[in-house]
Amino acid sequence: MADSEQQEDYKIQGFDADTQSLLKTALKEPGSVDLEKAASVIVDQSLRDATFSREAGRMCYTIIQAESKQTGRTVFRSTLLNRLQVEYKNRKETRARSLQEWVCYVGFMCNVFDYLRVNNMPMLALVNPVYDCLFDLVQPDNLKREEEVDCLVLQLHRVGEQLEKMNCQRMDELFSQLRDSFLLQGGLSSLTQLLLLEMIEYRAAGWRMTDAAQKYYYSEVSE
């Protein structure tokens, strides 16, 4: 537990002292701080900082669990989900304005989906929004941007298997589109083609990568 707290402390070092205090208290005594503000701070930072967005889901999960246990309320979770919904509705404008913010948003959404559970199951309310973001990433124009391809691959490695269990049909549709792009779309970089092929084979192998495949793709990407 001490290691976990140190990791969380480490993730919030970029905040000012007051915000660090707010988040540290929210993690341990959520009933004594403004959880709506804490949720907004975490989302805002996640949209700016890719490293933070990849880890913030764990912090959200910790606060949600602590609030439920100590107060029986869901203020933080409700605020977080409402904010994610707003950002989801504005995602096309976000992408047009800032590619980095858009990629951070997708990473954060998938991270929250990965960590948040209801009765030991992923949150149903997040399944289709996460899928919609992944479908956005496999659009022809998006596949020409390395940042979006990297994001797509990272998120499918993170939550692809869980998503497929929640809605197999949409995953079939996503990979049908991904295969078509790999086979038919011109103008893709050799790295993008390699990453798309890796994802196709990764899913075909039951969301597992063989040692041989890992060595092959790793050596190709690093060259």
UniProtKB/Swiss-Prot annotation:
Subcellular location: Cytoplasm; Nucleus
Source species, domain of life: Eukaryota
Pfam families named among the record's database cross-references: MIF4G
Entry keyword Nucleus: yes
Domain MIF4G: 9-206
Keywords annotated in UniProt: Cytoplasm, Nucleus, Translation regulation
BP-aspect Gene Ontology terms: regulation of translation
GO molecular function, one term: RNA binding
A GO-annotated cellular component: nucleus
Primary localization: cytoplasm
Sequence similarity: Belongs to the MIF4GD family.
Function: Functions in replication-dependent translation of histone mRNAs which differ from other eukaryotic mRNAs in that they do not end with a poly-A tail but a stem-loop. May participate in circularizing those mRNAs specifically enhancing their translation.
Self-association state and partner proteins as the record states: Interacts with eif4g1, eif4g2 and slbp; probably tethered by SLBP to the 3'-end of mRNAs ending with the histone stem-loop, it also interacts with eif4g1 which is bound to their 5'-end.
Protein name (record): MIF4G domain-containing protein
Species per Swiss-Prot/TrEMBL record: Xenopus tropicalis
